[in-house]
């Protein structure tokens, strides 16, 4: 009976679908934090759909994302839908400044003014493609030509639309701000259905942490990740300060370590010890030991041993002949692969005797130097991490 009459409206369903796409995109963005490079925060539903913070040698900058989807996959975004520009208007001086300012791209370009040098870029992300006119406009900006008729309108109206107070931007300043605009079109994980999104998330988790997840384990992590993004996207931030923004909108490495059940202490120890792949190392050490029944104290102990080994090895490269270092590393690798169990399981108790035997062997070949049982143990876990990278 219900199907016999079409519903008066389905705007709620459409709005929920768009919100779901926004959450998915932010969830994928948060996983880039695991890479351990310059992305250290993602802020959800703050100033725009989400914001990525980059922290490099020159300081903090922000990438503002706006996520828009369309149900019809064969639809292309028009220049009017995105920029508020009428494509068939012969006299470009009659373009409406208000339409430009209130358009999707107009709202993104405002960030380049409000946040000035702290705005790294602004991104329009979608599940569909752009029209040829939009592509031509972006090619014109990216090439540095700025000769397209629609680009000329944006330049001409920039101060009227986005100028703050009496401040007027020069031609070069306007070009610099327009050049911060980027498009990410036909994004697979924004399309209908879960298969693309699930695949991207699983690949990124493996890429940054070397965790091979069983189906049930992956679903649990995925649900926790989506729940985290939804929580950070909801509610009003009543006290507008840095601490409140971090608490109610920000996602950091701490949140992701919790979701992936990776020891924060082990991660920090490895990070502070100079390991550039601290997430991956902590994950692999923890999973191999926990498979053998170890607790978190064993994870911390083995992580510290790996740090000490890495430091010893870096220093030894300047003192010990390379052939001898290679011989030591080869013997440690052999000890590892003789000791590792099913699914990469390692138990500290089963490593004691092989480590002692290896030290005796190294001494007999004049390769012991100042190596200890703890350093050899660290070398074994260093070999484990390198072997799976």
Question: What is each residue range found by the language model?
Answer:
Residues 38-40, 58-63, 117-121, 365-367, ...:
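Generic structural motif recognizing short loop/turn segments at the entrances and edges of beta-strands
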Residues 12-16, 22-84, 101:
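Catalytic centers of nucleases
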Residues 51-52, 130, 244, 311, ...:
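Low-complexity, compositionally biased segments
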Residues 1-17, 69-354:
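Acidic metal-coordinating catalytic centers involved in nucleic-acid phosphodiester chemistry
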Residues 350-389:
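Hydrophobic, glycine-enriched assembly/anchoring segments
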């Amino acid at each position: 009976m219900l199907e016999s009459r079409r519903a008066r409206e389905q705007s709620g369903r459409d709005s929920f679908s768009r919100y779901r796409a926004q959450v998915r995109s932010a969830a994928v963005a948060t996983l880039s934090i695991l890479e351990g490079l310059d992305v250290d925060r993602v802020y959800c539903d703050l100033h725009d759909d989400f914001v990525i913070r980059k922290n490099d040698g020159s300081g903090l900058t922000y990438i503002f994302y706006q996520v828009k989807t369309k149900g019809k996959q064969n639809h292309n975004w028009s220049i009017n839908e995105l920029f508020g520009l009428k494509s068939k208007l012969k006299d470009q001086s009659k373009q409406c400044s208000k339409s430009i300012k209130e358009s999707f791209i107009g709202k993104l370009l405002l960030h380049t003014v409000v946040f000035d040098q702290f705005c790294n870029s602004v991104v329009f992300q979608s599940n569909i493609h752009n029209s040829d006119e939009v592509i031509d406009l972006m090619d014109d900006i990216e090439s540095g030509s700025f000769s397209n008729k629609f680009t000329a309108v944006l330049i001409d109206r920039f101060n009227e639309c986005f100028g703050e107070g009496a401040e007027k931007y020069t031609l070069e300043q306007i070009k610099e701000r327009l050049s911060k605009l980027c498009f990410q079109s036909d994004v697979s994980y924004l399309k209908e259905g879960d298969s693309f999104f699930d695949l991207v998330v699983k690949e990124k988790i493996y890429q940054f942490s070397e965790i091979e997840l069983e189906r049930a384990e992956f679903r649990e992590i995925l649900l926790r990740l989506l729940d985290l993004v939804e929580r950070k996207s909801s509610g009003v931030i009543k006290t507008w300060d840095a601490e409140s923004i971090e608490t109610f909108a920000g996602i950091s490495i701490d949140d992701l370590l919790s979701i992936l059940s990776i020891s924060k202490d082990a991660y920090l120890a490895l990070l502070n010890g100079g390991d550039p792949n601290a997430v991956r190392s902590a994950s692999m050490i923890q999973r191999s030991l926990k498979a053998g029944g170890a607790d978190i104290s064993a994870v911390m102990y083995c992580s510290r041993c790996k740090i000490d080994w890495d430091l010893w090895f870096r220093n030894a490269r300047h003192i010990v002949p390379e052939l001898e270092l290679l011989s030591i590393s080869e013997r440690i690798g052999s000890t590892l692969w003789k000791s590792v169990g099913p699914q990469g399981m390692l138990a500290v108790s089963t490593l004691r005797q092989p480590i002692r035997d290896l030290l005796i062997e190294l001494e007999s070949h004049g390769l012991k130097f100042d190596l200890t049982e703890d350093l050899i143990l660290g070398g074994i876990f260093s070999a484990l991490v390198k072997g799976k990278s």
